[in-house]
């Protein structure tokens, strides 16, 4: 996931739309630690309790034996507040997930980073585990320490199937993480056109803005002139909206080159003409 930094320098005071070193856009190419996909837990066998270890390696028989003895807590936590359910979900053991649920484990429990088993299943691309959790009442709107929901992780993982399933279970389409990114803004930042299309069809707010008041069209123009720009322009995009530095989408376009600037302004003029004709 790319990280966006504010414009540096002073804003130009004239009406020129040429490139200016006074308003460059800085874009880091590395992913921030707040949101990543595919990462399971880093575990050390010697630190694992018996129930946790059985869940981690998917040993159903041992898990049954431990649970039948009733001397092991199905909701027991390790040093990082992870339960056996967290570990089973991270490793994709649907049978273990079902067994733990049958034995009354807590489903919406959070680890040391506030990640629920559902968030962990989505983060690790374990759709079958996520499905079982949702069927048994997992809350898709709980957030981790960075305020990411399971839907944010599904978007980051480019998993439309999982995103759709989460929305079927009332996931909040407009939830914002600590960067102010809704799932749509995140999809645009990741330059994932298929996910952008999907979220727009589901009714995502095209004019939602991040903590710097940047809308989807602005973020698309920062990433690079992409097909997502054209897609967003087909929506009811507010081109007059200003970010915290006072820049509009048209100015973002001008920073990225003359051609893209005219693509935006031409679309804006067409919208104005359409509105005038309507009256």
UniProtKB/Swiss-Prot annotation:
GO terms for biological process: blastocyst hatching. The keyword Repeat applies. Residues 1-25 are annotated as: Disordered. It comes from the Eukaryota. GO terms for cellular component: nucleus. Gene3D superfamilies: Ankyrin repeat-containing domain (1.25.40.20). PROSITE patterns: ANK_REP_REGION, ANK_REPEAT. Keywords: ANK repeat, Repeat. InterPro entries: Ankyrin_repeat_domain, Ankyrin_rpt, Ankyrin_rpt-contain_sf. Residues 1-11 have a biased composition (Basic residues). ANK repeats lie at residues 80-109, 113-142, 146-175, 179-208, 212-241. PANTHER family: ANKYRIN REPEAT DOMAIN 36-RELATED, ANKYRIN REPEAT DOMAIN-CONTAINING PROTEIN 7. This is Ankyrin repeat domain-containing protein 7. It comes from Mus musculus (Mouse).
